[in-house]
Amino acid sequence: MASAVDLAPVPRTADESTVSTAPSLGIGDVLRRLGHDQKSMWGFPLKAVRGAHAKATVPFVATTIALVVLDSHDTPYFRRTSRFSTFNRDFSGLKTGLAEGLLPVAVVLTGRLRHDSYATDSAWLAGEALLDAEVIAEVSKHITLRLRPSDISPTGDFGRTWFRADFLSGASFPSGHTAGAFALAAVFSARYRNHRWVPWVAYGVATLVGLSRITLQAHFPSDVFAGGVLGGVIGHTVGTERLGQTGP
């Protein structure tokens, strides 16, 4: 997989916009690529420590730290209010999780019914990015073991949350739902970037998913920010690898 911080859109030449040179993807291709993806992503922190990609890494780390500091001040409001009950019902963790998992499947089936290999490949890439993002998120959660806001009483201490969660019950940092949502949004935005409405809708829905994780008290704002950035970078990197294909 390409560098996780190579965020510049890949330009398409006139030949690339009309000729597809890459064979269509399948589930076997995605599974084979996952190992390479994960090796590349888990090697990134070591490169960052050595000073590589500082322009992308430093702002991300600094913003995450700032949000972590603010978590103990902003999270109690969401822990104590019931103003978001309707929104929380519409964007429950179960609903958003199912939607993320079923979206690539639906696009694959639609692409096959319409004999649209570009749509089918887009769906496989979306599934690849989703799996990559979820693996990163879940492993990170088991390393940081951060309590969820819902694990803390409304009048409790929201400042002492790290390395206190039960290893088997689930932890908070980063948000897996948000990482998955932004990974999907980034893939489809890259693949269908000629349709100006796609990025607006894709990233708009992903943002709503991220906000719901805060109002549901499943995550702190810093968890959501970190998950969104990680998912977005992963999705963009995966989604721009095959832009030489013929697309809409």
Please identify what each model-predicted range represents.
Residues 51, 56-57, 113-136, 199:
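Interfacial segments of alpha-helical transmembrane regions
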Residues 1-96, 100-114, 142-143, 150-171, ...:
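N-terminal targeting leaders of membrane proteins
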Residues 153-248:
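Membrane-embedded catalytic cores of phosphoryl/pyrophosphoryl-handling enzymes
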Residues 83-84, 118-119, 194-198:
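Membrane-helix interface segments
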Residues 82-89, 121-124, 226:
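Non-cytosolic membrane-interface motifs at loop->transmembrane helix junctions
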Residues 63-67, 128-142, 199-213:
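Small-polar-interrupted transmembrane alpha-helices in polytopic inner-membrane proteins
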Residues 110-117, 188-194:
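Juxtamembrane helix-break-helix junctions at the cytosolic face
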